[in-house]
Amino acid sequence: MSDKWDQRFIDLAFHLSGWSKDPSTKVGCVVVGEDREIRSTGFNGFPRGISDDNERLTDRAKKYPLICHAEENAIMHAARIGVSLKGNTAFVTWPPCSRCARSLIQAGIREVVYPTPQELSLIHI
């Protein structure tokens, strides 16, 4: 991490990842403007209104078609409340998949920050 603020936002993303009910993968995302103001947040989970019962969460054939990644949820939340993410930075607990990287670019995110493998090895969740 480059400074104490980067670490704070990564720590917050890890906190948000704990909100995910997915038993196997927990990812959090915090999108921050140039003024260090939080613009949006997200964690991986099912869309609003979709039951997140244990059967769906543990059956990959049922889970994967429905699950929204943390980055997607942060982008969709910002769109829902009318907040532009253009020029912002996304802090994510894990390197984005190619689909999320594409979505972050399309949303105008200028930078993505995530822990290095060495930093991840020091984190105990």
Kindly give the residue locations of the regions a language model identified.
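Zinc-dependent deaminase catalytic domain
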Residues: 1-123
